[in-house]
Amino acid sequence: MENDLKRFLDAKKREPRLLGDIERHLMRRPLGDRSTTVLHPSEIIKNDFCYKYSYYLMTGGVSKKEKPNLRLQSIFDEGHAIHHKWQNWFHEMGNLYGRFECKHCHTSVTGTSPTVCEGCGDTRMEYKEVTLVDDKLRIAGHTDGWIKGIGNDCLIEIKSVGAGTFRYEAPELLLDNDGDIFKAFNSIKRPFRSHLLQGQMYLELGKRMFGDEAPNEIVFLYELKADQSYKEFTVKADYEIVDRIFFKAEKVIKAVEAEVMPECNLNPEEGCKSCNLIP
């Protein structure tokens, strides 16, 4: 028994065989180059969106970014893989509209499920989603897809769901189901609030860009990471749900144009966790 305990403790002290190298590799990778000169729907829908900090970033301020550790990067990559899987199915079906890029010569084309590159004839076309922008308000985002040929056009948002999703979006579902994520997933009856706001923003941005040609509904595709269970929710466009979000964007852009930094809208006296990072 004593020898078993010693071997166990010795094993705990051993240097990792491969994990350390992977972690160092991830730390050496450059950070993503997400623009800070536009407002991203995924950011401005948050309750902790700060006018002052957004002004700082949009006027040349540098955001404090930390590289994700191995676990967090694995979570991100798993989500990306789930997105790609669903998008690839719609591409194979011939229903996926948006911008595609040839993986060989990088020729870009906008269309519905192209199968061959017009530039070089290669068949490896990578989906680059649909960019939705409002130039006046400097809002820019990417919806996960625009589906054509299956009834009326619709946008799609693909969401991978795990325990962390429930803790952040709907902790009550975990509590009501005794922490069982499988039961919690089955009990989801509608899109989570932040997903709904993001989707409604994409619908409104689409309307502002494409007018009557824009989709009037969005389909949320939820997949449970643990066992690949899935759900879908269809939501019609309703601008009233996000009018206050666009109002927030307008407040920030007016401040940027006037070159006057606004006060923190979350805590005017002491500032918030975001704007307190401003040097």
Language-model features: where?
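Metal-dependent nuclease catalytic cores that hydrolyze phosphodiester bonds in DNA/RNA
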Residues: 1-155, 162-178
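Metal-dependent nuclease catalytic regions and adjoining charged, substrate-binding loops involved
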Residues: 2-7, 168-169, 178, 186-196, ...
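Long, contiguous hydrophobic alpha-helical segments, chiefly transmembrane helices and signal peptides
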Residues: 141-143, 158, 195-201
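A structural motif
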Residues: 156-158, 248
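Residue-level recognition of conserved beta-strand positions in structured domain cores
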Residues: 158-160, 222
